[in-house]
């Protein structure tokens, strides 16, 4: 009997997302319920955005939740390497095989030509897709151009008509027309693979039997299925999980809800409660109980109990469930958890240097730095009254800073400062003009320790969360203002 093997393959390009944890949990439960193995693979082929710091954050976030893996970059295993950036020669071998078999071809089209083709297709109300310009190039000519060093990608061939039948474990048979499929790039000009080739090759070589991934990948499933067919490999069973949603049913995004696992850890949620809540996203226990452990979820797990309705990630509901867990802790464990959350040495060492020189007694620490240990702050609107900026300008400055910080990938004091400075100067203000607004939103006070240091310590999600709360207190942006301010944001670059 084949051993069930599932995997999660996150990209280390930012804070660890609750959606990643959700998919990881269901992969883990499916594997364990069938006596199988769960693998962690790192998709780091985006060399510009991938960092080892983000990779470590993924490990830390999943382990904080109690999710452990059998094989991965940090624990090793018989199917490594488990970082895609270290598997380049493997992908090249299989890319070359597809070209040799006539299932893929080198494409030399420039970005300008592709943009022109796309514009013409859209003008003619056609589905934008590659037009096959290089598909019938003479192989000798293509080889000559490659040898000469001409930039190129490798594209896969796809049928131009008919339908692909996707067998989904949750939906049954899903038919998707081939006329909706592009001739997917498999190998980029830099020699690195795209998601499609890397995932198919890795899943096959690592013996993955079941692929549970987000439903946003369902429309592109025919490309993966066709690659398995081209290689002559057995395809794993596919399961497209429903996406997490905001309470307004929109796709979960950091613009509306904190999406980083690290945020919830910093807010003081118990990992058991967080995992419990993620387990209830579209799935339920047979007896419908709301509170359960990971072990109980694994014991009773049945993938067919997953609902396709679009699970709502509701912070209020999560807080309620966390409260249930907190109140059932023995008092000694409750005290230990508080110490671990607020007064762990690593966090205290980040805060202490900024507090030590400003106090004369320990009792002065709480009024000065209590905001480091808080979630949402009780804000006084009077803190946002400004001598130079009117009420609209205050909201505009704060909204633009929030948007800039949402796009910031490396959360460092210098980069945070640069974002705020850029917005201030673009609007004709000085940095010192907007800093009181940052103090008010982030610390809830008119002055405190350096707010820029505080933002770095609090981290991106908690900082953005507080800015969002402050903006809501002040009325936020109207639809008209949001449209105008987004144009301003675009001009900032």
From Swiss-Prot:
Query: Where along the chain is Zn(2+) bound?
Result: 107, 109, 134, 136
- What InterPro entries has UniProt attached to this entry? aa-tRNA-synth_I_cd-bd, aa-tRNA-synth_I_codon-bd_sub2, aa-tRNA-synth_I_CS, aa_tRNA-synth_I_cd-bd_sf, Glu-tRNA-ligase_bac/mito, Glu/Gln-tRNA-synth, Glu/Gln-tRNA-synth_Ib_cat-dom, GluQ/Sye
Q: Kindly list the GO molecular function terms attached to this UniProt entry.
A: ATP binding; glutamate-tRNA ligase activity; tRNA binding; zinc ion binding
Q: Which SUPFAM superfamilies match?
A: An anticodon-binding domain of class I aminoacyl-tRNA synthetases (SSF48163), Nucleotidylyl transferase (SSF52374)
Write down the Pfam families for this protein, in alphabetical order.
Anticodon_2, tRNA-synt_1c
Q: What is its EC number?
A: 6.1.1.17
Question: Which HAMAP family does the UniProt entry name for this protein?
Answer: Glu_tRNA_synth_type1 (MF_00022)
Known role: Catalyzes the attachment of glutamate to tRNA(Glu) in a two-step reaction: glutamate is first activated by ATP to form Glu-AMP and then transferred to the acceptor end of tRNA(Glu).
The record's comment on protein family reads: Belongs to the class-I aminoacyl-tRNA synthetase family. Glutamate--tRNA ligase type 1 subfamily.
Q: What is this protein called?
A: Glutamate--tRNA ligase
């Amino acid at each position: 009997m084949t051993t069930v093997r599932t995997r999660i393959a996150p990209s280390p390009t930012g804070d660890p997302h609750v959606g990643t944890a959700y998919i990881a949990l269901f992969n883990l439960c499916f594997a364990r319920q069938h006596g199988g193995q769960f693998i962690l693979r790192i998709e780091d082929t985006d060399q510009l955005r991938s960092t080892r710091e983000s990779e470590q954050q993924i490990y830390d976030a999943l382990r904080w939740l109690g999710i452990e893996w059998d094989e991965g970059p940090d624990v090793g295993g018989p199917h490594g390497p488990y970082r895609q950036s270290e598997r380049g020669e493997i992908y090249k071998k299989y890319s070359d095989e597809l070209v040799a078999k006539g299932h893929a071809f080198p494409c030399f089209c420039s970005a300008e030509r592709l943009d022109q083709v796309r514009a013409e297709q859209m003008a003619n109300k056609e589905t934008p897709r590659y037009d096959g310009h290089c598909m019938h190039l003479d192989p000798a000519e293509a080889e000559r151009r490659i040898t000469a060093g001409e930039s190129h990608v490798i594209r896969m061939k796809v049928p131009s008509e008919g339908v692909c039948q996707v067998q989904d474990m949750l939906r049954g048979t899903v038919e998707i027309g081939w006329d909706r499929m592009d001739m997917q790039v498999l190998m980029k000009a830099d020699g690195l693979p795209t998601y499609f080739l890397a995932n198919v090759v890795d899943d096959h070589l690592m013996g993955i039997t079941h692929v549970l991934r987000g439903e946003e990948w369902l429309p592109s499933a025919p490309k993966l299925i066709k690659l398995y067919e081209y290689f002559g490999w057995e395809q794993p069973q596919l399961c497209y999980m429903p996406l997490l949603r905001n309470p307004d049913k929109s796709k979960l995004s950091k613009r509306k809800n904190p999406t980083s696992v690290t945020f919830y850890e910093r807010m003081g949620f118990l990992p058991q409660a967080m995992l419990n809540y993620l387990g209830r996203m579209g799935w339920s226990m047979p007896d419908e109980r709301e509170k359960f452990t990971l072990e109980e979820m694994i014991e009773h797990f049945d993938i067919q109990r997953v609902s396709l309705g679009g699970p709502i990630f509701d912070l209020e509901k999560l807080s309620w469930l966390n409260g249930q867990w907190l109140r059932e802790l023995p008092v000694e464990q409750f005290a230990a958890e508080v110490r671990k959350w607020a007064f762990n040495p690593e966090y205290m060492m980040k805060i202490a240097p900024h507090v030590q020189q400003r106090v004369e007694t320990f009792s002065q620490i709480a009024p000065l730095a209590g905001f480091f240990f808080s979630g949402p702050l009780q804000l006084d609107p009077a803190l946002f009254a400004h001598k130079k900026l009117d009420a609209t300008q205050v909201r505009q400055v704060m909204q633009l800073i929030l948007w800039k910080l949402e796009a910031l990938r490396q959360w460092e004091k210098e980069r945070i400062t640069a974002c705020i400075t850029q917005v201030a100067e673009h609007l004709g203000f000085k940095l010192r003009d907007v800093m009181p607004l940052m103090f008010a939103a982030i610390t809830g006070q008119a002055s405190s320790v350096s707010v820029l240091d505080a933002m770095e310590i609090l981290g991106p999600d908690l900082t953005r969360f507080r800015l969002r709360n402050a903006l809501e207190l002040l009325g936020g942006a109207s639809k008209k203002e949001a449209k105008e301010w987004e144009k301003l944001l675009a001009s900032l670059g």
